[in-house]
UniProtKB/Swiss-Prot annotation:
GO molecular function, one term: protein phosphatase regulator activity
Gene: ppp1r10
Cell compartments where the protein resides: Nucleus; Chromosome
CC per GO annotation: chromatin; nucleus; PTW/PP1 phosphatase complex
TFIIS N-terminal domain: residues covered: 73-147
Zn-finger (C3H1-type) residues: 785-813
UniProt protein name: Serine/threonine-protein phosphatase 1 regulatory subunit 10
Biased composition (Low complexity): 606-618
SMART domains (alphabetical): TFS2N, ZnF_C3H1
Bias type Basic and acidic residues, positions: 153-165, 173-190, 495-504, 589-604, 704-715, 758-777
Subunit structure: Component of the PNUTS-PP1 complex (also named PTW/PP1 complex).
GO terms classed as biological process: negative regulation of transcription elongation by RNA polymerase II; positive regulation of termination of RNA polymerase II transcription, poly(A)-coupled; positive regulation of transcription elongation by RNA polymerase II; RNA polymerase II promoter clearance
């Protein structure tokens, strides 16, 4: 068939000449063609169509033709393939086809189709498929049973015919009896196990030949026993049992010669059996005498006296039952002969009709007690051969039983508990089968996507009903804890602790901080030099004291302080600008001042007015002093080498030192006394000390205590900054305390009366000379060093151990700072 997709209608049209109106095969030749097409088909569509064609065909000849040409074997191959692939629809179709075919036992033996179907009926996961397989198995079992029963029945018929021919001289029976026996035989094979008991009956019939002489002897004795009511069977049977043994002995002797005559028939027991049931009239009398010994044996097992009476009336009323009972008893009457007892178990005729013969076969040895067997005989007769059942009640104390169970809340019920081993085995088999099929199915799985992925729709979940941590007190405790504990920083994953608990406290010994002296031990001065007490030059503008200035204004005010004009005499325009910037805000923060919309415009205007003032207005001073250039705001002016500075009153001091007042003492380094401090950036520092002013010899000067009485004069330059560790002269203007050599009492200084010197030396007024010290040790490389290479130690560490003796450039120390 083609490799492309197949249209079922086209396929059926191609088979139109073979098929009838209902889709069935019309002729035998057509079935052969269908079989050839089935062998070549590989697609599921083709196979299903062909299976349906076979299902629609109902002619037994055509179906038999299909089986003969090999259709049954082909279905076996398809069944194996479908079971391997776990194709349930195909399996269902194949099972229906197998159920439709007229299979025989020989066909079922050809391959393992029956075995596969039986496995499907037990282990299939599909419930419908399992039921269908079970029905098919039951149908096949019925076929097997019917055929196996028919075959032995035919064989028995042949044997019976031969036996009847051989036994005809012994028996005077007519051919009608044989035909009746054969009819009985035909009926008996339907019940498989009735054949053996029928033989036992026939044995009893063999005894029936001479039963006429036995009948008159035993009839009178058992009849009165049977006529008695049910309540008095025990004594009657005991009486009857006494004469019975005497009668039974001659009867047994008579039976023996009868049995001996047809010894050949004994050897072939089956042959003797058929004629005996016909002669039931005379045989009943013999049975009445025979059952007593047989029943004795049974009674040994069950000694029940009260019900024995009921047995006798039933015996007389039902001759057929009596005959069945006599058959086992007849062989027993001969206690000395064991051969008869051996024959008894082989005659289970009553076993089918009555369950007694099983008991009869077991108890043959105990024959001595004769009274008990008679009672048992009566009991069995009353029950029609059924076992006696008794009803009893327990004692009153045991009528009620109470069971107390305590509730265990922790107890768990195992719902999946397996009830029995059968269920466990079935589950295990299903699991193994599923695992095997999965392994085979996934062995060639290429893991390709078969079902396309579809993005699931979004779920609209309701909002949280409870706000997490809304009433939590732990978060406040955690916040308080974090306020007193430093944050732990982990630089690597290995340093992260396993648990979030607090780290172990580190053990350390607190040590007092080291005190680093700012002066040498030999220095005698203590404390910081107090600021000047002159409050005459307080700034006039309240805005300079009232608020913190922004950095721009602070630099501006610092430049104004270093300008040639007095700081307290501001131009009107500048005063108005400052008042407009700061007056309205009061004590506002600098950030708020800078947020004003026209802040930048006001600053530009202020700077412009200040520049014009510096250019057009010369500083007051002696004649010959020229005007200075624009003020450097926030940066020291470039140093001048080999330049003789003008007198201190007219030289513009560096930005680190405000110029002295017109009439007052030299102002402090932080601006005019009493004025706002920090009006500009502090002077550059080096290792925590003020930078020495440029253009100085660092050897004392006019501020160092005068000329020392003609010794070292006052041409040493400006004083060192405060707290600078040099050995210059100590004295000078009142705001500075330097170290230098105290001069002798010289001429009075320019600022007032003589100062006090150390060691009979006097300095200028207000300067206490501290004699006895050598010259300044830090000089040697003065002036601007910016032309030299930068000191790498100073750039890396921020300091240099050579300090001012270093031959390299220290930005901001021995030269201007870096841009």
């Amino acid at each position: 068939m083609g490799s492309g997709p197949i249209d079922p209608l086209e396929l059926l049209k191609g088979l139109d000449n073979i098929l009838g109106q209902g889709g069935e095969v019309k002729a035998l030749e057509g079935m052969a063609k269908i079989f050839n097409l089935m062998k070549q088909s590989q697609k599921m569509v083709n196979r299903c169509i062909y299976l349906n064609i076979v299902l629609q065909t109902h002619s037994p000849d055509i179906l038999s033709k299909f089986i003969r040409v090999g259709g049954y074997k082909l279905l076996n191959n398809w069944l194996t393939y479908a079971r391997t692939c776990n194709n349930s629809p195909l399996l269902h179709q194949i099972l229906l086809t197998l159920q439709h075919l007229p299979l025989t036992v020989d066909h079922l033996k050809q391959n393992n189709t029956a075995k596969l179907v039986k496995q499907l009926s037990k282990s299939s996961e599909d419930e419908e498929l399992r039921k269908l397989a079970g029905i098919l198995v039951n149908d096949w079992m019925a076929v097997i049973r019917s055929q196996t029963n028919i075959q032995p029945a035919d064989k028995e018929k042949k044997k019976k015919k031969e036996d009847a021919k051989g036994s005809s001289p012994v028996l005077d029976k007519t051919s009608e009896a044989k035909s009746e026996d054969n009819g009985d035989k035909k009926e008996k094979p339907k019940i498989q196990r009735t054949t053996a008991p029928s033989h036992a009956k026939f044995r009893s019939t063999g005894l029936e030949v001479e039963a006429s002489s036995l009948v008159p002897v035993k009839k009178p004795t058992p009849v009165p026993v049977l006529s008695d009511k049910y309540l008095k069977p025990v004594p009657v049977k005991r009486q009857s049992s006494v004469p019975v043994p005497g009668d039974a002995a001659p009867a047994e002797k008579k039976y023996k010669p009868l049995n001996i005559v047809p010894n050949t028939t004994k050897e072939i027991k089956v042959k003797i059996i058929p004629p005996q049931p016909i002669e039931s009239l005379g045989f009943l009398d013999a049975l009445n005498s025979a059952p007593v010994p047989g029943i004795k044996i049974k009674k040994k097992k069950k000694a029940v006296s009260p019900t024995s009476n009921k047995a006798s009336p039933f015996d007389s009323k039902s001759p057929t039952e009596a005959s069945s009972l006599t058959k086992p008893s007849s062989p027993e009457p001969e206690p000395p002969v064991e051969g008869m007892e051996v024959e008894r178990p082989g005659t289970p005729v009553p076993a089918i009709e009555l369950p007694e013969p099983m008991e009869i076969s077991a108890p043959p040895p105990p024959a001595p007690s004769e009274t008990k067997p008679s009672e048992a005989d009566a009991s069995q007769l009353t029950k029609k051969g059924k076992k006696r059942k008794t009803v009893s009640w327990p004692e009153e104390s045991r009528l009620r039983e109470y069971f107390y169970f305590e509730l265990d809340e922790t107890e768990r019920v195992n719902v999946n508990k397996i009830k029995d081993f059968g269920e466990a085995a079935k589950r295990e088999m299903l699991k193994d089968r599923q695992a095997f099929q999965n392994a085979r199915r996934h062995s060639h799985d290429t893991m390709e996507e078969v079902i396309p992925w579809v993005l699931p729709r979004l779920l609209n979940l309701p909002g949280a009903l409870v706000q997490m941590g809304s009433n939590s007190t732990e978060k406040h405790a955690q916040a308080e804890r974090e306020m007193g504990i430093l944050q732990e920083i982990f630089l690597s994953k290995e340093s992260v602790p396993d648990t979030p608990h607090e780290p172990d406290p580190e053990s350390y010994e607190p040590s007092p901080p080291k005190l680093i002296p700012l002066d040498e031990d030999c220095s005698m001065d203590d404390g910081v030099y107090p600021e000047s007490m002159d409050q005459s030059t307080e700034s006039q503008s309240p805005d300079l004291n009232g608020a913190k200035l922004p950095p721009v204004l602070a630099n501006l005010m610092g430049s104004m302080g270093s300008s040639k004009s007095p700081p307290n005499t501001l131009p009107g325009t500048m005063q108005e600008i400052l008042t407009s910037i700061m007056g309205a805000q009061g004590n506002a923060k600098p950030e708020d001042l800078m947020k004003q919309p026209d802040f930048s415009e006001k600053i530009k205007h202020l700077l412009g007015s200040l520049q014009n003032q510096n250019q057009n207005q010369g500083p007051p001073g002696p004649a010959g002093q020229g005007s200075q250039g624009p003020v450097n705001i926030g940066f020291p002016p470039p140093s001048q080498k080999n330049h003789q500075p003008p007198p201190p009153h007219h030289q513009p001091p560096p930005p680190h030192y405000p110029p002295p007042g017109p009439n007052g003492p030299f102002q402090g380094p932080h601006g005019p006394p009493g004025g706002p401090r920090m009006m500009g950036p502090p002077p550059p520092q080096r290792d925590g000390y003020w930078e020495p002013p440029p253009n100085e010899n660092l050897r004392g000067g006019s501020h160092h205590g005068g000329e020392r009485g003609g010794m070292r004069g006052g041409d040493r330059g400006p004083p060192p900054p405060p707290f600078h560790r040099n050995r210059g002269g100590r004295g000078g203007e009142p705001g500075y305390r330097g170290r230098g050599r105290g001069g002798e009492r010289g001429h009075p200084g320019r600022n007032g009366p003589y100062g006090m010197g150390h060691g009979d030396h006097r300095g200028h007024e207000g300067h206490r000379g501290h004699g006895g010290h050598g010259d300044h040790r830090g000089h040697g490389h003065g002036g601007d060093m910016s032309t030299r290479p930068t000191c790498r130690h100073f750039m890396m560490k921020g300091n240099c151990r050579y300090e001012n003796n270093c031959a390299f450039y220290h930005p901001g120390i021995n030269g201007p700072p870096l841009p």
